[in-house]
């Protein structure tokens, strides 16, 4: 299966089982939780999984990194079409993604097909709240368009947020996220906003009991999960391999 994200959880026996989510069937994903709850682990796990299985001919990235830290290591991958960390560049990168989506739909119309057959494009946002606080007027319409029409064009939005409020995750945008990964939250109200029920506030404290526990809301289904953390050296090795001139020349 292609375009998968890692999802792990502990079984009653204590072992770790790692199935996968088919991202092509769940086009958009929101990851939210308090600081230190495991958002970065989940996000890097998704990217790692794609790098280990997909070439730039199959998967492309638009990386939105307002904190300038989490996604910087992926900037020079051959998969990366756009990397943006400054607000003007972020707006331009999102506009490029919208234009690319429109281009794909025009091509589909010309070919009389209902679904795009080219590379999947992942628009990955490390901190959605930063965009909604600082440049909401410019970015919200672009994100809504991507989330509303991206699926048939193989355009996926994956967004992280540690600020769990309606002002920073607008409801019209949130409604387009078919899958939500709710990590530990500060209170029950935030949990209900994320996954439509309480529970995230009672997840293990990441400072004392471990990171990466969460609830996965996938349509009507709700599942308690644990996110697997890939060793950093494995991710670094994958990045190095893809960025090597020998690898690119052999593609």
Question: What positions do the PLM features span?
Answer:
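P-loop NTPase catalytic phosphate-binding loop
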Residues: 1-114, 118-207, 211, 215-216, ...
């Amino acid at each position: 299966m292609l375009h998968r994200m890692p999802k792990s959880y502990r079984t009653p026996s204590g072992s770790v089982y790692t199935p996968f989510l088919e991202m092509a069937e769940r086009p958009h994903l929101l990851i939210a939780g308090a600081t230190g709850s495991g958002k970065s682990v989940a996000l890097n796990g998704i990217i790692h999984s794609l790098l280990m299985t997909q070439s730039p001919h199959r998967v492309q990235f638009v990386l939105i990194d307002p904190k300038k830290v989490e996604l910087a290591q992926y900037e020079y991958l051959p998969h990366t079409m756009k990397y943006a960390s400054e607000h003007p560049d972020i707006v331009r990168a999102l506009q490029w993604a919208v234009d690319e989506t429109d281009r794909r739909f025009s091509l589909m119309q010309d070919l009389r097909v209902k679904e795009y057959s080219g590379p999947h494009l992942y628009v990955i946002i490390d901190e959605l709240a930063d965009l909604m606080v600082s440049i909401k007027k410019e970015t919200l319409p672009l994100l809504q368009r991507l989330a509303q029409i991206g699926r048939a064009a193989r355009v996926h939005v994956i967004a992280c947020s540690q600020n769990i409020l309606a002002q920073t995750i607008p409801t019209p945008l949130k409604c387009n996220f078919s899958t939500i990964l709710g990590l530990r939250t500060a209170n029950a109200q935030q949990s209900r906003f994320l996954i439509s029920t309480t529970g995230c506030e009672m997840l293990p404290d990441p400072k004392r009991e471990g990171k990466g526990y969460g609830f996965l809301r996938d349509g009507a289904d709700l599942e308690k999960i644990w996110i697997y953390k890939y060793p950093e050296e494995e991710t670094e090795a994958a990045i190095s391999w893809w960025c090597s001139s020998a690898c690119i020349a052999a593609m």
